[in-house]
Amino acid sequence: MSETSATSLPVTEPLPAPAPAKLVDVASLSLEALSRFVTEELGERAFRAPQIYRWLHQRGATSFDEMTDLSKVLREKLRARAEIVPLVKDCELRSTDGTIKYRWKTRDGRYIESVYMPTEDRRTLCVSTQVGCAMACGFCMTGTMGLKRNLTPSEIVAQVHAVNREVRKNEGHETLRPLSNLVFMGMGEPLHNFENLKTALSILQSEDGPNFSHRHITVSTVGLVPMIERFGKETDVKLAISLNASTDEQRSKTMPVNRKWNIAALLDACRKFPLRQGRRITFEYVLIKGFNDADEDAHRLIELLKGIPVKVNLIPYNENPGLGFHTTGEERAEEFRAILADGHVAAYIRRNRGRDIAGACGQLANRGETQAGTDSTT
């Protein structure tokens, strides 16, 4: 039998190299999930998990090299199997009232925004949960973007870590966590990204993490009724409802979600919401001139909210180009508030922060994207 030469063998394409194992986004893991990863995937003892977790979420480490009390071998294992997904600061815009809007670039080239609002007694961060938003509220600039994607738990939490670092650097704070309050009222509908929000909240409230109290975290929703029930059962932070109208006709014109879950369904969910002793649901009501700011609106609002422990935040509309709405004047806003107060509804006119940098309520839309380190608002 003749030998077969190498040149006579059939020509075949080389087999592709095996795809590299996907790295684990380690900062998106709850402490329980991190413990499983450390013991089952890395073969390490369980006590290493809270050690790594504290580096990530108390100290805000952005690389495994910073974790100096871990062995070199463990750090090598982490580099081989896991990653810390970065948020890169694209720019910061400073308002005359002290508010700072931060724009972050994600690894896939998307942009999100967070707004830092310092006052004498608190330092609050407004956090985003999505790139864009699917809710399409007619008075909100974020709604004009559409939904690009959900943020991961690590991208939600990274906003908090990054602003903590900025505040420590800029204001000279020695504490690892100068921020006192978090409001999930930035880009996106938080309950539309509920699983990632829930994981982020567990990280932010962990004693091995930033350790925010449930009293100092508020999540706002346009009214995804089925998710409000889950939110009440599976988290313990405060709830805010973006209402903005006193009739279904009004609300459906500006908030498409109302066509699926109307005001009656929304308020029924609020009446069933489990509230801690002494806690109230916040209702946000954007005052739009000639649309929802009449005396009749205030009286209807009083009737709608009966039986619900509430406070109402009245928010003078922040005008956005091209949306066709105008803000209610200060005098009219005060008259509206007084009617609510006479009806035994606790109501407050919220001072808008960051309007001059498009950082106020309803203005976040990545306008004026710039390169890192610049301060342009154009």
From Swiss-Prot:
Annotated compartments: Cytoplasm
**Primary enzyme class:** transferase
Among the GO molecular function terms of this UniProt record, one is: rRNA (adenine(2503)-C2-)-methyltransferase activity
Q: Which residues are recorded as binding [4Fe-4S] cluster?
A: 133, 137, 140
The residues that hold S-adenosyl-L-methionine are 188-189, 220, 242-244, 318
Q: Which cystines does this chain contain? A: 126-361
Q: Does the keyword RNA-binding apply?
A: no
Q: Which residues form the active site?
A: 113, 361
Which family does the similarity line name?
Answer: Belongs to the radical SAM superfamily. RlmN family.
Q: Its function?
A: Specifically methylates position 2 of adenine 2503 in 23S rRNA and position 2 of adenine 37 in tRNAs. m2A2503 modification seems to play a crucial role in the proofreading step occurring at the peptidyl transferase center and thus would serve to optimize ribosomal fidelity.
Q: What else is known?
A: Reaction proceeds by a ping-pong mechanism involving intermediate methylation of a conserved cysteine residue.
| Protein name as annotated | Dual-specificity RNA methyltransferase RlmN 2
Organism name: Myxococcus xanthus (strain DK1622)
